[in-house]
Swiss-Prot record:
Any one GO molecular function term: calcium ion binding
Protein name (Swiss-Prot/TrEMBL): Calmodulin-like protein 4
Gene: CALML4
Pfam family, one: EF-hand_7
PANTHER family for the chain: CALMODULIN LIKE 4, MYOSIN LIGHT CHAIN 1, 3
Stored InterPro entries: CALM/Myosin/TropC-like, EF-hand-dom_pair, EF_hand_dom
Length: 153
């Protein structure tokens, strides 16, 4: 697993895993899997967490060790692709498949659907992504700007 995850990630995962390893036996309860994964920034649904457990033949009342947990986290992270999720959301809004969405329509969707953004949050997002208030937002450019890795100073 070390070839897929950095040592820093493994250390962070171990620290969080240890908080839920109440009896300090190197295991967490299967019922805690979803919580631990979310604490580490993953976004599994309850169904996804259950499928991970089933893949490893772990009963809902069972336990999993750290090695299994690392494998599960790796699989979850691999399937969570923000670029793909953003593209799918934009394609749903683009009924005519033009390859772009009007900024006004994107603003409306961001403020009304899902985890609603405020007007200021949308304005900040548009400013950072270089989107004109009444312009066209091309998917590929928008996704590229949104998913640029943040520099670690």
């Amino acid at each position: 697993m070390a070839k897929f995850l950095s040592q820093d990630q493994i250390n962070e995962y171990k620290e969080c895993f240890s908080l839920y390893d109440k009896q300090q036996r190197g295991k967490i309860k299967a019922t805690d899997l979803l919580t631990v994964m979310r604490c580490l920034g993953a976004s599994p649904t309850p169904g996804e967490a259950q499928r991970h457990l089933q893949t490893h033949r772990i009963d809902r009342n069972g336990e999993l060790d750290f090695s299994t947990f690392l494998t599960i986290m790796h699989m979850q992270i691999k399937q969570e692709d923000p670029k793909k999720e953003i593209l799918l959301a934009m394609l749903m809004a683009d009924k005519e498949k033009k390859g772009y969405i009007m900024a006004s329509e994107l603003r409306s969707k961001l403020m009304q659907l899902g985890e609603k953004l405020t007007h200021k949050e949308v304005e900040d997002l548009f400013r950072e992504a270089g989107i004109e208030p009444n312009g066209k937002v091309k998917y590929d450019e928008f996704i590229q700007k949104l998913t640029i890795p943040v520099r670690d100073y």
